[in-house]
Amino acid sequence: MSLRLATFNIENLMSRFDFGGFRNELLQDRALSLYKIDNQKEYEELERARTIGLSDDTRQLSALAIAATRADLVCLQEVDNIEALRAFEYGYLYKMIGRGYRNKHVSTGNDSRGIDVAVMSREETRHGQPIEMKSVASHASVTYEQLGLHTAELAAMGLGAHERIFKRDCLEVELDVGGRPFTLFLAHLKSMNGGRNGQNGRDYTMPVRVAEAAAIRRIIENKFGREKAAERNWAICGDLNDYRERIVIAGDEFEGFRFEHVREERSGIDPLFADGFCVNVVERLPEKERWTLYHTRGPEERHLCQLDYILLSPALAARNEGRKPDIIRQGQPFRTVIPPGQEPNRFPRIGWDRPKASDHCPVAMTIDVI
């Protein structure tokens, strides 16, 4: 019984306009910053036109990226609401692939911008086996205190024990695939932005992700039992916003790029891997092919890393030992520095920076659920 599973940070699938750039220049789009805008009304009119004009190209490319996964079930991050997801699926994705993702759910999580996690599935796999979404449960309201995960590091950041652990949500989805049980845990962890006190963004925010990762593990162990969790059919999918290794980029297009594999001493998602709790299937690929995101702050700081994960229970990973994931890179912009031999055949109309499918690459894998 096989299921094609994918995860994709679709990057701001919004149904709202953001006019924050009128009062905060740091939030203003670079295209609008070229022009003299006299008042807020004029700014809002221009921002609407800019957003709508770019969105059509962007969502065609996002749909192409999802279509390329050939997935039966897709986990999404950064979705505004169910209306936005329905409009995207019908207006863009359905027109490309026909047989639609009829079952959809969008979480109402804790993100301050209102970007949530979502799941959509077909009614049956591409091989004709029924997919039943039996239940969907949110863990957005779980606090540090409830799971005993509050630490001195979190307190130093101003986070109290009574506060919610997940910055978005951990969505628990119970499925039957051809009569076989399968549980999906979908998450989008705290971003690595916002360094303070002399620390970079990744290091400063790491305690939050450590707690989120530990909470996901605790939720799974509480559900299946600590001793039995390894034997059950489950997967963790999503943008976990941290990496355990990366490809550091040096050089330039004139003298040639150099790519160095670097393994990190610690990561915010380490609790998920301690004692072999789960298996990162992307690590079945060669080291320099595991990346799902290109990060840059100019020539002095560039790397490729994995932020997007499909993590399988040990039993499920063992039953799929011979399978490897696919990372869809055709939607990446031309500014992404890609190692030799990995250059994708990009989708039509991809730009240097935009339009693009997303800043993230979808990850997909066929899994035998037995």
Task: List PLM regions with ranges.
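Short secondary-structure boundary/capping segments
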Residues: G20-N24, E89-L93, N200, I249-F259
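Metal-dependent phosphoester/phosphodiester hydrolase catalytic core
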Residues: F19, K167, L175-F185, L189-R218, ...
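Extracytoplasmic/secreted cell-surface and envelope-processing proteins
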Residues: A84, R113, N193-G195, Y243-I247
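N-terminal, active-site-proximal structural segment of metallo-dependent hydrolase catalytic domains
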Residues: M1-M96, H105-D116, L159-A161, D368-I370
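Metal-dependent phosphoester-hydrolase catalytic domains
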Residues: M1-R4, I82, R218-A235, L240-I370
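Extended recognition/assembly regions associated with phosphoester-bond processing machinery
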Residues: A31-L34, E45-D57, N81-A87, L93, ...
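Active-site flanking residues adjacent to catalytic metal/cofactor-binding acidic residues
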Residues: F8, Q77, A187, G238-D239
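Structured beta-strand-rich core segments of catalytic domains in phosphoester-bond hydrolases
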Residues: S2, L73, V79-K190
